[in-house]
Amino acid sequence: AHFLVLGDEAKGDYDFEAKKLTAKHFEHPDDTKPKVFISELRVNELSETAQAIIKKMVDQMPESVVDADNFLYSGKHWDVTKAEYDTLLNESEYAAWMAAWGFRANHFTVSVNHLTRTDELTDVNTLLKEAGFVLNTSGGEIKGGPDVFLAQSSTMADRADVAFSDETV
């Protein structure tokens, strides 16, 4: 609903079976605005232990948080222990990341469609790496391609301390 209010339209549905994710991408009619990809973890496909941890997290959230204007970047609304994080990480990197960071962008992708100096994603990747950015190489530096009407690369986030309820790592 948050993107629809801004004029974005749902354009594509995706299934990442190995990661237990369902995703959707949104586009604004103004093609200078970014495409947005939202993914959802299929919690019911995780173990009962992982499901219980996630339920405990969700139960700590005030119901009103999902309607707030800042919901998409509102961060973590729960306490989670390092052991709970590790349990989630053992099953799903996505679940563990969400437990640690909450609601916020996981990564950003580079669109070459509007660049004037190059129209090759490989050139953009080279520029990013030369500037010190680390690319997400899981599945290759370039994901997708002409067959799915999308080719993308993404950078990795910097390392940062994560505060759990019982320790900071």
Give each language-model segment a name.
Residues 1, 11-169:
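Extended, well-ordered protein cores
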Residues 2-6:
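The feature marks the mature, well-folded catalytic cores of soluble enzymes
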